[in-house]
C-alpha cells in the first residue's frame, strides 16, 4: 500500500524539522508521496512564512516597499537549504518570484510558501518534485 504523508508548517519550520521529516518518511518505505506546508514558526516570536507572504502581498497591493519582508522570506529558505547542504537553486527562483511579484494574484503569492518548501524537501528526500 502506498501512503501519502502530509507535514504541516511546524514540521518543516527549519532544517532540524526537515531532518525529523526525513526520518519519519524513511522509517516506512510505503510513504512514497510527501506533501508539505509552508514553513511555520520556529519559536513563539517567529513568523509563519504564509503570514509573511500575505504581508508581502499587502505591501504589493498598497505600493509599499516590500524588500524587508521579502528578505525574511528569502532568508528562511536559504537557511534551510544551506543547513541541509542542498544544491537547489532556490535563491534564483525566489528572486525571480520577487521580481515578478506584480504579475501574481494573492493566491499565487501565498502558495509560494508550499512550493518553495516542496522544492527543498523533494531534493532532501531524493524524491521527484511534482
Identify the role of each PLM range.
Residues 1-130:
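Nucleotide/pyrophosphate-binding catalytic subdomain
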Amino acid at each position: 500500500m502506498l501512503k501519502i504523508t502530509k507535514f504541516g508548517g511546524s514540521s518543516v519550520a527549519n532544517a532540524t524539522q526537515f531532518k525529523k521529516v526525513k526520518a519519519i518518511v524513511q522509517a516506512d518505505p510505503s510513504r512514497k508521496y510527501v506533501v508539505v506546508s509552508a514553513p511555520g514558526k520556529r519559536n513563539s516570536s517567529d513568523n509563519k512564512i504564509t503570514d509573511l507572504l500575505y504581508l508581502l502581498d499587502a505591501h504589493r497591493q498598497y505600493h509599499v516597499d516590500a524588500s524587508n519582508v521579502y528578505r525574511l522570506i528569502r532568508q528562511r529558505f536559504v537557511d534551510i537549504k544551506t543547513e541541509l547542504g542542498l544544491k537547489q537553486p532556490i535563491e534564483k527562483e525566489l528572486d525571480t518570484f520577487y521580481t515578478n511579484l506584480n504579475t501574481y494574484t494573492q493566491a499565487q503569492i501565498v502558495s509560494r510558501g508550499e512550493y518553495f518548501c516542496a522544492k527543498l524537501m523533494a531534493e532532501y528526500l531524493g524524491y521527484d518534485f511534482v
